[in-house]
Amino acid sequence: MLKEPPKNSREKTKNLLLTLQDKICSGLENIDGKGKFTEESWLRDEGGGGRSRVLKNGSIFEQAGVNFSEVQGKELPQSIISQRPEAKGHEWFATGTSMVLHPKNPFIPTVHLNYRYFEAGPVWWFGGGADLTPFYPYLSDVRNFHKEHKKACEKVDKDLHKVFKPWCDEYFFLKHRNESRGIGGIFYDYQDGSGNIYRGNNQNGEASKVSENIGKSNLNWDNLFSLAENCGQAFLPSYLPIIEKRANKTYTSKEREFQLYRRGRYVEFNLVWDRGTIFGLQTNGRTESILMSLPPLARWEYGYKAKKGSREEFLTSIFTKPQDWLNDKDLENFCMENNIFD
């Protein structure tokens, strides 16, 4: 039986996620220098609402969206009931902050973040994560992103990152393309401190195997709240140094074209596979906010093949496959030799 969450659980998570939205928006405006977020507050007919913030045509960001929502409903959709059958027939509450940034410069990666909390009758859980999608590969950027999120997870429990990293690789995977959306990061869902850490669907995958070896989770509500807090705070230090390094790098029209081509994969994932998009649409969420994750421009090209030995080819052959980014010395040497380390 799950322990009940604290009496102020909803207010506490709501405030955490509102603060996260504020801090991220402030950090992004500061580094962009030109663009400002416009805010739109909205209400949902079935209960709750949110505030959507979008920055367009900044000096760094072509489009950046940071959303907060706090919503309630009578019955969770079947996609969630299948994971949490105890929630069936109960009214539910969900709050979350989600973000997708689409920079203009192809050398700055697209990035996504989402942290959320659910309650439904006797059950509650936390979910979240952050992942990076580069268009041009630089191992040092990838390492910084992973290092900061690993550190955030390990503040709560030394074993979490061992599961969340492969879980992220598994989740952000385009099955119809047989490639990863980007270089991963962390991903977790249905965390309530009971059972094993891994709660995904692939029992034969690395995340499941690592989780099985670790055994039962002994985290409580406060630990999982701290996890969301730590990981949320890790975002700016994981990403802003990449912008600082790459923002002034000039790019060609060919590199911009490749960025737009790869953005097409982002669109495909979000519309075909992403559970957050599907949940939002199934629960009559605000469509403009749900589809804010899509880039303002993208392109498709039939039968595209990158030139062998090009940076574009290194992206598609190495940086869209799960790797041990932090520890693989062979990968490090390869990136050094091919000028894609830093």
UniProtKB/Swiss-Prot annotation:
This is Oxygen-dependent coproporphyrinogen-III oxidase. SUPFAM superfamilies: Coproporphyrinogen III oxidase. Pathway: Porphyrin-containing compound metabolism; protoporphyrin-IX biosynthesis; protoporphyrinogen-IX from coproporphyrinogen-III (O2 route): step 1/1. Belongs to the aerobic coproporphyrinogen-III oxidase family. The record marks H176 as: Important for dimerization. Substrate binds at S98, N114, Y115, R116. One of its GO terms (cellular component) is cytoplasm. It catalyses: coproporphyrinogen III + O2 + 2 H(+) = protoporphyrinogen IX + 2 CO2 + 2 H2O. Gene3D superfamilies: Coproporphyrinogen III oxidase, aerobic. Residues 266-301 are annotated as: Important for dimerization. Involved in the heme and chlorophyll biosynthesis. Catalyzes the aerobic oxidative decarboxylation of propionate groups of rings A and B of coproporphyrinogen-III to yield the vinyl groups in protoporphyrinogen-IX. Its main location: cytoplasm. Pfam families: Coprogen_oxidas. Keywords: Chlorophyll biosynthesis, Cytoplasm, Heme biosynthesis, Metal-binding, Oxidoreductase, Porphyrin biosynthesis. HAMAP family: Coprogen_oxidas. InterPro entries: Coprogen_oxidase_aer, Coprogen_oxidase_aer_sf, Coprogen_oxidase_CS. A divalent metal cation binds at H102, H112, H146, H176.
